[in-house]
């Protein structure tokens, strides 16, 4: 493999344009995405999911980026304008927002491939040698330069980034691949009920991460052919990739940690349980996702907030947090916070007990509340004395959503308050 830090890779990234698919709702997140697209969802105390693929682009040296939006995009667009508009267009750097605008058809984006097809004129104007198509709703840290080097080294027409996952986890959830000994893709199945087992890893299958590198001319050919096919759903995983495997050089790039030779960190966070768990992993002493790695920072919009504050140390009340992440603007006023994430501007009032919970921005939790294993959506005001997560039958009766694994989602609408911004 070519040295990922070489000037060679720098030239490859300069010849690359990235298009991030950020128009999905994330329906398995239920009410959490009623008012926002999944890529706009908060994650990790201060970030949004879209910040991860964008940061990967910047850190990899890819500075021509388009973000394709569609479903309830207001909060996503606002975040991109505030946090990702600092590039120098005159130097060929930009993050541009590409909403569905019916360029090539009277329809909005009809699928992942159609979304790229409807922006062919923009790609043509930029004339990149390679086009990287990225999913905008996954959490991971990845050097795309290494994948580009692999793509060129193998002479691939298309390279698909992939990761080894347990078969039971992939069934019905991910596109999976069958590969030969050289990682050439022999078969691609979109969300099969019975994924193909890896020969070298029993119990595991090779799942698509939803990231693709195309040679630009090859991409144009496939998109135009797909657009003319009335039977197609215009989706990369369902239509384009299965159709080109036989007669094209399509490769799988395994996303692995070279130091441990194991699968690298990658989370789909597509369900309430997986979203809650991925956040909870971050409060562990040494989580696999290192948000403190200065060599690979996650960039985001920085709000101007005061430091977090913890007050009261009386016999009957003490404001503190343990095994937790607490963001700027938070005040823990005589309450207990354990194994939880508090996003910005959260106020935990006296005598409150908050445990194993993810609290999104601008939340007020009033006195004597008891909350366990919950996701509290932005802008909620938890009334005094409210108990959440300790009696699931009662939670369900009040209109809260309780997952199969016992995580409770609370939104403003469920509390009878105003709809989220």
From Swiss-Prot:
Alpha-D-glucose 1-phosphate binds at residues 109, 175, 190-191, 208. Transmembrane segments: none annotated. Keywords: ATP-binding, Carbohydrate metabolism, Glycogen biosynthesis, Glycogen metabolism, Nucleotide-binding, Nucleotidyltransferase, Transferase. It catalyses: alpha-D-glucose 1-phosphate + ATP + H(+) = ADP-alpha-D-glucose + diphosphate. InterPro entries: ADP-Glc_PPase, ADP_Glu_pyroP_CS, GlgC_bac, GlmU/GlgC-like_hexapep, NTP_transferase_dom, Nucleotide-diphossugar_trans, Trimer_LpxA-like_sf. The keyword Cell membrane does not apply. Gene3D superfamilies: Hexapeptide repeat proteins, Spore Coat Polysaccharide Biosynthesis Protein SpsA, Chain A. It comes from the Bacteria. The keyword S-adenosyl-L-methionine does not apply. Pathway: Glycan biosynthesis; glycogen biosynthesis. Homotetramer. Involved in the biosynthesis of ADP-glucose, a building block required for the elongation reactions to produce glycogen. Catalyzes the reaction between ATP and alpha-D-glucose 1-phosphate (G1P) to produce pyrophosphate and ADP-Glc. This is Glucose-1-phosphate adenylyltransferase. It comes from Teredinibacter turnerae (strain ATCC 39867 / T7901). The gene is glgC.
């Amino acid at each position: 493999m070519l040295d990922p830090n070489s000037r060679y890779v720098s030239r490859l990234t300069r010849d690359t344009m990235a298009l991030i698919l950020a128009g999905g709702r994330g329906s398995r997140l239920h009410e959490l995405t009623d008012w926002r697209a999944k890529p706009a969802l908060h994650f990790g105390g201060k970030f949004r999911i879209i910040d991860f693929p964008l940061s990967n682009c910047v850190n990899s040296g890819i500075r021509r980026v388009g973000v394709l939006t569609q479903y309830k995009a207001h909060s996503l667009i606002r975040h991109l304008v505030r946090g990702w508009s600092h590039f120098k267009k005159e130097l060929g750097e930009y993050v541009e927002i590409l909403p569905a605008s019916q360029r090539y058809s009277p329809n909005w984006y009809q699928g992942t491939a159609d979304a790229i097809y409807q922006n062919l004129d923009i790609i043509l104007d930029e004339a990149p040698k390679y086009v990287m198509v990225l999913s905008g709703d996954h959490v991971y840290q990845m050097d795309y330069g290494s994948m580009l080097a692999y793509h060129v080294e193998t002479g691939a027409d298309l390279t698909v980034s992939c990761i080894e996952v347990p078969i039971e986890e992939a069934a019905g959830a991910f596109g999976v691949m069958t590969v030969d000994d050289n990682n050439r893709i022999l078969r691609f199945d979109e969300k099969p009920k019975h994924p193909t087992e890896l020969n070298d890893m029993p119990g595991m299958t090779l799942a698509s991460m939803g990231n693709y590198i195309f040679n630009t001319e090859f991409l144009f050919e496939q998109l135009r052919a797909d657009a003319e096919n009335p039977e197609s759903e215009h989706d990369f995983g369902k239509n384009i990739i299965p159709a080109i495997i036989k007669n094209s050089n399509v490769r799988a790039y395994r996303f692995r940690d070279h130091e441990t030779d194991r699968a690298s960190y990658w989370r789909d966070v597509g369900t309430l349980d997986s979203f809650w768990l991925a956040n909870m992993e971050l409060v562990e002493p040494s989580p696999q996702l290192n948000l403190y790695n200065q060599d690979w920072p996650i960039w985001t919009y920085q709000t101007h907030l005061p430091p977090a504050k913890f007050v009261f140390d009386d016999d009957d009340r003490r404001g503190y947090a343990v095994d937790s992440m607490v963001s700027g603007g938070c005040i823990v006023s005589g309450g207990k916070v354990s194994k939880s994430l508090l996003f910005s501007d959260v106020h935990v009032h006296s005598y409150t007990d908050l445990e194993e919970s993810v609290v999104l921005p601008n939340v007020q939790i009033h006195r004597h509340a008891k909350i366990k294993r919950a996701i509290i959506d932005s802008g909620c005001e938890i009334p005094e004395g409210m108990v959440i997560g300790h009696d699931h039958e009662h939670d369900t009766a009040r209109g809260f959503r309780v997952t199969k694994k016992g995580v409770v989602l609370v939104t403003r609408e469920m509390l009878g308050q105003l709809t989220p911004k």
